[in-house]
């Protein structure tokens, strides 16, 4: 495929469960990582997680699942676990923030990661999803005050939430805002996805690079933004129907070099 950064779903993303590891799997993974020079490697947690809702059973299960993910990531030497905080389902961010922080503290306490980070992904903003605005992510980071927690910045979700990325000036403004509110020092990885729907649509629909509303000019601008140069870019696009592929990686490389 020609990629040099990796994200995987170690368990089916639409079902509850955490990775199950044994010594053989751990050893095999670490040998392969060493063979290929330890590329940036991330887990994406299951999509069912909701730490922001009012159902205590759902929150408890979400906490347990995320804890298992973070433990496994740390055992393997994976860079981090990317996750969606969930939806407050109309209760409001301020109402649910204390509960979110409580559960995330417990995840960190129980997993006790030495190197793997817990990475909050920004959301598209549909249905009370938490983290669509940079200010909400900043509140969670500040409330935790833990260097083991960082951010995954998703280009499609940001665009759907109203952060424009279509021109060099748009990208500069959005990254200025991200740095001012969240702090680029907290951003660990970028999900690089075009958007099927328009600016501020609050809809999470990924498109192949250059075929959506952000467009090639937007991604060229993102790839040439010097403040993002050291970060891995992870594709989460449909490709030819089976997800990210060599063609989409080649598109990014072409835009980065043009």
Residue ranges and their predicted role:
Residues 1-45, 49-71, 258:
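N-terminal pre-domain/capping segments
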Residues 4-8, 41-45, 81-83, 118-120, ...:
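Hydrophobic faces of well-ordered beta-strands that scaffold small-molecule active sites
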Residues 12-25, 49-52, 88-91, 126-131, ...:
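Acidic-and-aromatic substrate-binding clefts and catalytic sites of carbohydrate-active enzymes
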Residues 23-43, 100-113, 138-144, 213-226:
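Alpha-helix-loop-beta-strand connector modules within alpha/beta enzyme cores
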Residues 51-150:
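Active-site acidic/histidine proton-transfer and metal-coordination neighborhood
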Residues 134, 138-258:
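Histidine-acidic metal/acid-base catalytic patches
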């Amino acid at each position: 495929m020609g990629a040099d950064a990796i994200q995987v779903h170690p368990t089916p993303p639409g079902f509850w469960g955490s990775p199950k590891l044994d010594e053989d799997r751990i050893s095999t993974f670490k040998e392969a990582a060493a063979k290929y020079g330890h590329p940036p490697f991330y887990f994406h947690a299951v999509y069912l997680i909701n730490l922001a809702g009012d159902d205590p059973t759902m929150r408890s299960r979400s906490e347990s699942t995320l804890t298992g993910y973070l433990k496994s990531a740390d055992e393997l030497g994976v860079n981090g676990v990317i996750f969606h905080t969930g939806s407050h389902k109309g209760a409001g961010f301020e109402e649910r923030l204390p509960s979110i922080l409580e559960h995330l503290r417990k995840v960190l306490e129980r997993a006790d990661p030495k190197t793997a980070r817990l990475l909050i992904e920004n959301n598209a903003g549909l249905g009370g999803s938490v983290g669509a605005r940079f200010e909400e992510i900043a509140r969670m980071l500040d409330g935790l005050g833990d260097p083991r927690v960082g951010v995954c910045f998703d280009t499609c979700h940001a665009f759907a939430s109203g952060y424009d990325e279509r021109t060099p000036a748009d990208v500069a403004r959005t990254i200025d805002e991200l740095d001012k509110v969240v702090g680029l020092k907290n951003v660990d990885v970028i999900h690089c996805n075009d958007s099927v729907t328009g600016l501020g649509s609050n809809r999470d629909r990924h498109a192949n690079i250059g075929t959506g509303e952000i467009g090639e000019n937007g991604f060229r601008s993102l790839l040439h933004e010097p403040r993002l140069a050291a970060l891995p870019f992870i594709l989460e696009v449909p490709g030819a129907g089976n997800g990210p592929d060599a063609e989409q990686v080649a598109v990014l490389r072409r835009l980065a070099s043009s």
